[in-house]
C-alpha cells in the first residue's frame, strides 16, 4: 500500500527542521531514512500507532533579502507541499505569535482543501496554554495543537492528530501479476512524454485511474509482455526562480512512485547528462530494493560519432556505480526510437526480482566461491560460512550464517554478490546479503 505523505510547512525559523530532527534523533518508530537523500535528511519513513507514513521536512528554504522573495519562497514551498501531501502539518511559533506570513500561508491551505494540522511550536507549557496560543485558531483551520520540539512536549498528541487525517488503510492490494512501473527522473527529463508514448503505442489500454498521489495518473497497459501499470510522476511542471525547491520536491514525487512500484524506470536527459540529482533519484530505487532500468532519453538530439554510445554508457556506470547491475537503454520518447524494447527489459528485471534459489543450489555456489577465493581473516581467524539460504524476494535477499560476522569485509561480500550474478543472472536487481552469527545476530 502507498504510504501517506505528511509535509511540514511554515515560514522560516519556526522549527520545522527541529521537529523533524527530534523525531529522527529520538527514533520515535522511525523505520529508516529514505535512501539516496540522507545528505539533506528531508524525508523519513515513520510509523505511529501502526500507521506507516512519509514525513517531509521543507526546512532549508532560507530567505534571501527582501520581503517579496521571502513570500515567494513560502508560496512555492506551500503550493508544492499541498500538491504532494496527504496531510499538511502547518508549523507556527508561539514566541513570535500569529504573523501576517502565517495568515497568508493559511489562506493557501484553506483554498487547497487538504487536511491540515496547525502545530504551534516553542510552547513549554503543560496543560493550559497562554492566551496567545488561542490566537492561532483565528487562522480558520480546525485542528490546533501545541508542542515543544526542543523539549519533546506534545509530540504524541500531534502525531495522533496527524494519523487521524489519513485516508483509510486499503488492504486490497493487487494480487495478480500486474507489474507496477514508476517512471522517475528530474523535471523535464521526459517522464510525461515517455508515459504517453508507452500508453499511446498500445491499443489495449484498459483504463486511466486517478493515482494516490494527487496529480499522478496510472495507465494500465496490456501487451505481449504482460500486464503493466505505469505510474507517471510527470505532474511536476511548475517553473519558478527557486529551482532548488522545485528539484527537492521532484524527489518527493519520485519517493511516492518508488514506494508503489515493482520496477523503476530511471529516466536521464541525454543532453544534460547524468547529474547529481539523477544519482540521488536513482538512489531511491536502489536503496529501496527496486528492480530498475536506466533509460537515456532524447538520444535523437545527441550528435553521433564513433563511440558516442559507449562513452555515455561509461559515464552512466561512473556516475551511478551503485547501479552497475541495471541495464541501460537509449531511446527517444518523442520519436519512439527503441521505446519498443523497454517493456521486454521491464519484464526481465521484474522476473529477476522475484527469482528464488533453492538452498542446495545456493550453498553449492557458496562452496565453489569460497574455494576460489578464501574468506577474509583477522589475527589468524577466518570467516567461516556455515550455510546460506534465500529469505525473501523483491529484492532477492540471502542470509549467510557465519562464525563471526565481524570477520567479514565489504569487498568479500561484493565478491559473493558478483558470484550470484555470474551464476544466476539477477540483471537489473539489487541483491541483499545478511550476515548472521550462529546466535542469530544480524548484520
Each model region followed by its residue ranges:
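Switch I (G2) and immediately adjacent beta-strands of P-loop GTPase domains
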Residues: 33-69, 75-87, 211-241, 259-263
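Hydrophobic or amphipathic alpha-helical targeting/insertion segments
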Residues: 117-122
